[in-house]
Amino acid sequence: MGADPLRQAPPLAIGTTLVPMTELTLENTRTVEVFLHALQDADLDTAGAALADDLVYQNVGLPTIHGRKRAIKLFSSLGGASAFEVKIHRIAADGAAVLTERTDALIFGPLRLQFWVCGVFEVHDGQITLWRDYFDFFDMFKATLRGLAGLAVPSLRASLSPR
């Protein structure tokens, strides 16, 4: 008998049940990590390669963006005047679905807005088809206030620890 494909990766403990990680689940998790870090590195070629042509990108509460080209156009329009940083605190996957708990930072010159985000990604055939982020608008408001205060008092600026 051949090797059990569900035993290719070590199982994860959930409560008292062991849930085996499949190779596909690991690949999907890696796709999301590579994508987010490519955005951080302003590597839009790598980021774009991780997105499906028919991507649906939604920041809940804001307009939905449809398509890889439109998403990459949005990121490139932010260009040299801004930067993005990410710290992934937790990442979990089940088949095509990948969930992230992270801190994102949007940086516009000396203004830094840092806030928590939970993201849902769906990955099919090695490409992200759905990217839906949830964040708290009040948390974003506080990040804006802290960012503005950090302009006057640099010690108040938020920062992410290294990945």
Regions found by a protein language model. Give the residues of each.
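Short, low-complexity N-terminal intrinsically disordered segments enriched in polar/charged residues
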Residues: 11-49, 53, 158-163
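A beta-strand edge to alpha-helix "cap/lid" segment located at domain peripheries
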Residues: 18, 22-23, 76-163
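Hydrophobic pocket/interface hotspot
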Residues: 32-35, 46-48, 55, 67, ...
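A solvent-exposed, acidic/Ser-Thr-rich amphipathic alpha-helical stretch
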Residues: 44-48, 52-96
